[in-house]
């Protein structure tokens, strides 16, 4: 965004969650899908937040839940402040509720966990451990996609440490609609 401020309105890093058993009180919640994301996630995707402040995603252990998940798990009770447990050891505090995503989205999830460490993503953040992240951009003008793609290689060269000069890295921006159609996920 610092390198392409006129083209990019918002950007968000997302990591799909896998492998954690999620509990509310002593009840194992089955078939729960979650993602890790940052504070810009909801603005990047244009997802309305019904309760809470998305800026609270900066706090480690924060989670925002879909309105469907909130209704299924808590009924009519207010979910704000309730605790979800991951693997019976990491506490996630519900800080907000967002409008359900459309069923045809590539990101199917019941809740969004703060990507910030304590209790969140514990993997590598360096050059050799962050290749599992998806980065999503909201462009100010969809026509700028070619301009963004033209600038990506320059940005890679600017920020890649010299020790990786012999690595071949190719990145490009594609419209989310096309990603949905070509993704193998």
Regions found by a protein language model. Give the residues of each.
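Short amphipathic beta-strand/extended segments in non-transmembrane regions
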Residues: 1-50
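Sequence-level motif detector for i,i+2 pairs with an aromatic at +2
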Residues: 6-9, 60, 168
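Short secondary-structure transition/capping segments
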Residues: 22-25, 60-66
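Mid-to-C-terminal secondary-structure elements
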Residues: 35-51, 63-185
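Glycine-rich loop motifs involved in handling phospho/adenylate chemistry
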Residues: 54-59
């Amino acid at each position: 965004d610092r390198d392409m401020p006129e083209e990019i309105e918002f950007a968000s890093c997302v990591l799909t969650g896998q492998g954690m058993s999620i509990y509310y009180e002593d009840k194992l919640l089955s078939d729960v899908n979650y993602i890790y994301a940052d504070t810009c996630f909801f603005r990047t995707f244009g997802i309305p937040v019904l309760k809470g402040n998305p800026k609270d995603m900066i706090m480690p252990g924060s989670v925002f839940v879909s309105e469907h998940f909130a209704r299924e798990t808590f009924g009519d009770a207010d979910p704000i402040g309730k605790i979800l447990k991951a693997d019976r050891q990491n506490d996630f505090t519900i800080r907000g509720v967002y409008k359900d995503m459309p069923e045809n989205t590539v990101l199917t999830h019941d809740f969004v966990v703060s990507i910030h460490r304590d209790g969140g993503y514990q993997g590598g953040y360096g050059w050799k451990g962050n290749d599992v992240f998806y980065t999503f951009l909201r462009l100010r003008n969809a026509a700028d996609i070619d301009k963004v793609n033209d600038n990506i290689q320059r940005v890679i060269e600017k920020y890649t440490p010299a020790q990786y000069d012999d690595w071949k890295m190719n990145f490009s921006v594609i419209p989310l609609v096309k990603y949905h159609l070509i993704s193998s996920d």
